Amino acid sequence: MRKYVIMGIQGSGKGTQAKMLAADLDLVHISVGDIFRWNVQNHTKLGAQVRRTMAAGELVGDDLVESVVRDRLTQHDWNFGFIIDGFPRDPRQAEFFLESYDIDGVIELDLPDSEVRRRVLNRRLCADCGMDYNLIANSPTVPGRCDMCGGELITREDDTEEALAVRLRDYHDQTNPVLEIFRRKEYVYTVDARPAPEVIQQQIRERLGLPPYQPENRGSEVA
């Protein structure tokens, strides 16, 4: 059983890398962001709370994140292990995670703030089906329209210069102490997040001592 944590600023591609690794190793991908987005799209009470927070350009509170993760891990559907992104968010949560789960490694995707801005401010989202696009790396065939359903592509509410500046500051303030705790245990494997996704995935596997990346092994979830 393998248990990994993947960490990286918004726009670093941690969701993509987590899905690629999970599909090939039969791991469960636990994404705090995906859980929140599902609740927003389905207009739940949690979703309304998350929407208000994101619209203000702020990060969702640590207590709420911890509650969501604890609930998800109690489902015990991760027979072969899991890879989690979006948690832990503070030193206390990191200590709890180390005590509760025998993790195998923490993957840190390193991306300069200037590249984060370039990527995030070019993101687009289908208003109908939620498909993600990036005008730099994954642009739609028809400008402004989703390839999957033809829906209108919009900018996320929190993808503004002002909101991004707040998220970058908060991320660094919160994440550095967490990484220091993991580094003391020699669990952190830092990977350059600037190359193409397949190159990053190969670097991750080399750092973790896993077999080479084989693109044909990817599941449909990653396509």
Language model features: what each stretch is:
Residues 1-223:
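Glycine-rich phosphate-binding loop of ATP-dependent small-molecule kinases
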